[in-house]
């Protein structure tokens, strides 16, 4: 297929231009087949480091590696056609220096073909974000609750519920926006703060447990489909697929053990002998 005939993907500048416009729809995906489904309805597919929790059963996102993100990012790119694909930079791949961040981000962009990367952190990461943007790397920011910082935060509690924390997170968002981020994820903050951030920054905000006033929303796909045994308060279950999948597996196991499967329609017959 020629480049001219290929489906055109959304770009970071197009997402940036959606500020105060039609809400931006984002979901996570880690596989080609779910990416193909999500791609039909979403503006952005996030290959989140939450794959550590969802796919690998880690308690936090800290153990996730750059190689894991690249592998799943490539899968999502193969499964999608139109959405902007954003790949999370995992813990330890960008914090040491601006140069480390660029080296890691360049690997992700080159090896997956994705359109942007995401980094967690506010004022402390602003210089790094500007460094990346100035070198051709589109960056999505992430402020509020930053899961990669769980060992210093101590818990996954909502942020910005007192005046001091709220003021700090607002300044984080401003710094990330001014550094050149094309959008900012705002996670698990008090609703008035989510509104205030959205009004204060030039970049579109994408809320996850923030505010309906944000410029867009994101959820973890498995959470909203009912595939996770537990989900945060900010998740709305749009499906309850877990019990249905379990029932299908149970039925399969029962039919195998009773020799009801495979049936005659599931096996191959010999070719008929040629007529003499």
UniProtKB/Swiss-Prot annotation:
It is found in: Cytoplasm. The active site is at 187 (proton acceptor). Keywords: Cytoplasm, Magnesium, Metal-binding, Pantothenate biosynthesis, Transferase. One of its GO terms (biological process) is pantothenate biosynthetic process. Binds 1 Mg(2+) ion per subunit. It comes from the Bacteria. Coiled coil: none annotated. Its cofactor is Mg(2+). One of its GO terms (cellular component) is cytoplasm. 3-methyl-2-oxobutanoate binds at residues 49-50, 88, 118. Its EC number is 2.1.2.11. It catalyses: 3-methyl-2-oxobutanoate + (6R)-5,10-methylene-5,6,7,8-tetrahydrofolate + H2O = 2-dehydropantoate + (6S)-5,6,7,8-tetrahydrofolate. Mg(2+) binds at residues 49, 88, 120. GO terms for molecular function: 3-methyl-2-oxobutanoate hydroxymethyltransferase activity; magnesium ion binding. The keyword Cytoplasm applies. CDD domains: KPHMT-like (cd06557). Pathway: Cofactor biosynthesis; (R)-pantothenate biosynthesis; (R)-pantoate from 3-methyl-2-oxobutanoate: step 1/2. Catalyzes the reversible reaction in which hydroxymethyl group from 5,10-methylenetetrahydrofolate is transferred onto alpha-ketoisovalerate to form ketopantoate. Homodecamer; pentamer of dimers. Belongs to the PanB family. This is 3-methyl-2-oxobutanoate hydroxymethyltransferase. It comes from Afipia carboxidovorans (strain ATCC 49405 / DSM 1227 / KCTC 32145 / OM5) (Oligotropha carboxidovorans). The lineage of its organism: Bacteria, Pseudomonadati, Pseudomonadota, Alphaproteobacteria, Hyphomicrobiales.
